[in-house]
Design a protein with these regions (language model features):
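Terminal signal-anchor or tail-anchor transmembrane helices
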Residues: 1-33, 196
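Cytochrome P450 proximal C-terminal region
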Residues: 2-17, 43, 163, 190, ...
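Cytochrome P450 substrate-recognition site 1
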Residues: 35-58, 63-154, 158, 190-197, ...
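Cytochrome P450 I-helix active-site segment
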Residues: 37-47, 51, 156-160, 213-221, ...
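Conserved, non-catalytic sequence blocks in retroelement Pol enzymes and Pol-derived host proteins
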Residues: 39-43, 57-60, 128-131, 147-156, ...
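Cytochrome P450 heme-binding Cys-pocket and its upstream "meander" loop
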Residues: 61-69, 293-305, 402-451, 461, ...
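Classical protein tyrosine phosphatase
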Residues: 89-99, 106-108, 204-213, 315-341, ...
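Cytochrome P450 heme-thiolate monooxygenase catalytic core
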Residues: 111-119, 135, 153-322, 338, ...
C-alpha cells in the first residue's frame, strides 16, 4: 500500500477526538453534485460524511493519487469537502486553463490556513498575501528589485562556486574503492547546495546556522502539509487546541526568525560601518524599508516572512526535483547512458558545465515537486467547465495527474520516463513547459538544472548492492512537496576530472 504517513495520523486522531465534541453541531452535508443551494450547478464529487466530509476517500493513499483516482470517476472538475472546507480539484488541461487563464482574477488569491497564518505573519509574504494592494506592492518589489535578470545574472559566480564545491566533495567520495568506497545521499547534497546558493544570494555568505534553519524549513513543510484539525475545521477553536498545531507552528516560526534576526543585525552593522549596503537580497529589502515611500511600510516581520519564502522555494523544491531526476535516470539505464553521452559531448570542449550551454529542460512531468499546486481560493462566483464555483471555495490543481494523463501523453504509457517525448517529430514535442500549455505545469527548469547536468558530466552513478537498478524504490512521501520516501544513496564514479581536484 502507498505511503499513508504521519499526516493521516491527524485524521485518525481528529475522528476520535472531534466526533463526540462536534456531534451537536452535526449537519448533513449537501451532496456535492447536481444543483446546490440557490439552483447552482455544483461540480460532482464523492459522497460525504458528517463532520469529516470527503476525508475518508483520501485515507490510505497519497492525496494527489487519491484525487486522481476520484477524478476518473467524477470528472476533471470535482468538489470535495475536506473537513468543513469546500475544495475544488482540477485534473484536466481544459479545466486548468479556465481556472488559471480565463478566470485568473477570480482565483488570484490564496487561502490562509491556521498554520499559514502563523508562519506567514498573517499573510505578509508574497506567496500567501491576499490578492490586493499589498500583494501588488510585494510583487512589484520582486519584479523590479529582487528578481530582475540583471540581479539574477549577477549571482552567477555564486552558483558556479557552490556547484564547484559540491563537485569537489563528490569527487572526494569517488576516490574510495572497495570497503572505503563512499556514497552520496542525493537529496541532502542537492538541498544543501541550493540552500548555500540561496543563502549567499540573500545574505552574502553561507548561513552558519544552516542545519538548524533547514530543520525549521522541513518542520514548516510538515506542519502545512498534514491534514490537521485546525485546518480541517477552521471554525472550531477546540480543533486547534486539541491538535496543538498552532503552538508548534509558532515555535517553528520563532526559531527561524531568531536565526534571521541575528543575520539581519549583522547586515545592518556592516552597512553602518561600510557606509553603504551591499547588493544582496537582504540589503535590497532593508534599503527599501529605510527609504520608505511605500503605501504599506515594510515591517521587519514582513522582511523575515519573505526571506523564509525564498529559502523554502529555493532549497526544498530544487533538492526534491533533482533527486527525482537522478532516481529516474538510475532506474532507466538506457536513458542514463544517452543523457550522459549527450551532456559530455555538449560540454567536452569546455571541460565543465556552464550556464551558457543550458536550454530550458522539461524534466518534471512525472515528479513535479509540488504535485498539488499551492492552493488558490475563489474570490468571486464563476463557472469552470459549466459548473458553478461559489466564492470562498479552495481550489487545488493536480499537476501530478496532468503529467500522467494518457490523453495528453501518447506514445507509450504516461507513467514511463521517456525524455524522447520532447524531441522533434514526437507528438508532444511542441508542448510548452513554461506554463503556456496546461497539460504540463512543471515547477521550474533552466539554471536550477545546472547542478544535475554537472553530476552527469563528471560522474557515472550506481546504486551500491543493487544489480538491477530498474527495481529502485520510487515510493513518494506524504507532504506539500513530493519527496522520495527512501533516501537516494548513490556511489559516484569519476569519469571526467573536476577542476581544482
Amino acid at each position: 500500500m502507498e505511503d499513508a504517513s504521519h499526516g493521516y495520523v491527524y485524521v485518525g486522531l481528529a475522528l476520535v477526538s472531534l466526533f463526540v465534541v462536534l456531534l451537536a453541531r452535526r449537519r448533513r452535508s449537501p451532496p456535492p453534485t447536481a444543483h446546490g443551494d440557490g439552483g447552482l450547478r455544483l461540480p460532482p464529487g464523492p459522497w460525504t460524511l458528517p463532520i469529516i466530509g470527503s476525508l475518508h476517500h483520501l485515507v490510505g493513499k497519497l492525496p494527489h493519487h487519491a484525487m486522481r483516482d476520484l477524478a476518473r470517476r467524477h470528472g476533471p472538475v470535482m468538489l470535495l469537502r475536506i473537513g468543513e472546507v469546500p475544495t475544488l480539484v482540477v485534473s484536466s488541461r481544459d479545466a486548468a486553463r479556465e481556472m488559471m487563464k480565463t478566470h485568473d482574477m477570480a482565483f488570484a488569491t490564496r487561502p490562509l490556513s491556521a498554520t499559514l497564518h502563523v508562519i506567514t505573519c498573517d499573510g505578509r509574504d508574497l506567496v500567501f498575501a491576499p490578492y490586493g494592494d499589498y500583494w501588488r506592492q510585494l510583487r512589484k518589489i520582486a519584479v523590479t528589485e529582487l528578481l530582475t535578470a540583471r540581479r539574477v545574472n549577477s549571482y552567477r559566480s555564486i552558483r558556479e562556486e557552490e556547484v564547484a564545491a559540491m563537485l569537489r566533495a563528490v569527487a572526494a567520495a569517488a576516490e574510495g574503492t572497495g570497503a572505503a568506497a563512499r556514497t552520496v545521499e542525493m537529496r541532502a547534497a542537492l538541498t544543501a547546495l541550493s540552500t548555500d546558493i540561496t543563502a549567499r544570494a540573500v545574505f552574502g555568505n553561507r548561513c552558519k546556522d544552516r542545519e538548524e534553519y533547514l530543520a525549521q524549513v522541513d518542520h514548516t513543510i510538515e506542519l502545512t502539509a498534514g491534514f490537521n484539525p485546525a485546518d480541517l475545521w477552521p471554525s472550531s477553536r477546540l480543533a486547534g487546541r486539541l491538535s496543538g498545531i498552532v503552538r508548534r507552528a509558532e515555535e517553528c516560526r520563532d526559531t527561524a526568525f531568531k536565526i534571521l534576526d541575528r543575520i539581519i543585525q549583522e547586515r545592518l552593522e556592516m552597512a553602518r560601518s561600510d557606509g553603504a549596503a551591499g547588493e544582496y537580497l537582504i540589503d535590497v529589502l532593508l534599503r527599501i524599508q529605510k527609504e520608505g515611500g511605500l503605501q504599506f511600510p515594510l515591517a521587519m516581520d514582513d522582511i523575515k516572512a519573505n526571506i523564509f519564502d525564498i529559502f523554502g522555494a529555493g532549497s526544498e523544491t530544487s533538492g526534491t526535483a533533482l533527486a527525482w531526476a537522478m532516481a529516474e535516470l538510475i532506474r532507466n539505464p538506457t536513458v542514463m547512458r544517452k543523457a550522459t553521452a549527450e551532456v559530455r559531448r555538449a560540454f567536452a570542449a569546455a571541460g565543465a558545465v556552464s550556464e551558457d550551454g543550458l536550454g530550458e529542460l522539461p524534466t518534471f512531468r512525472l515528479h513535479p515537486p509540488l504535485p498539488l499546486l499551492l492552493p488558490r481560493e475563489c474570490r468571486e462566483p464563476c463557472r469552470v467547465l459549466g459548473y458553478d464555483v461559489p466564492r470562498g471555495t479552495q481550489v487545488l490543481v493536480n499537476a501530478w495527474a496532468l503529467g500522467r494523463d494518457e490523453r495528453y501523453w501518447p506514445g507509450g504509457s504516461p507513467e514511463e520516463f521517456r525524455p524522447e517525448r520532447f524531441e522533434d517529430g514526437e507528438a508532444t514535442a511542441a508542448v510548452n513547459f513554461r506554463g503556456a500549455d496546461f497539460e504540463f505545469l512543471p515547477f521550474g527548469g533552466g539554471r536550477r538544472m545546472c547542478p544535475g547536468i554537472a553530476l552527469l558530466f563528471h560522474f557515472d552513478w550506481e546504486v551500491p548492492g543493487m544489480a538491477d537498478p530498474t527495481k529502485l524504490d520510487m515510493t513518494e512521501a506524504f507532504g506539500i512537496t513530493a519527496r522520495r520516501k527512501a533516501d537516494l544513496h548513490l556511489r559516484p564514479l569519476l569519469r571526467v576530472s573536476v577542476p581544482g581536484v
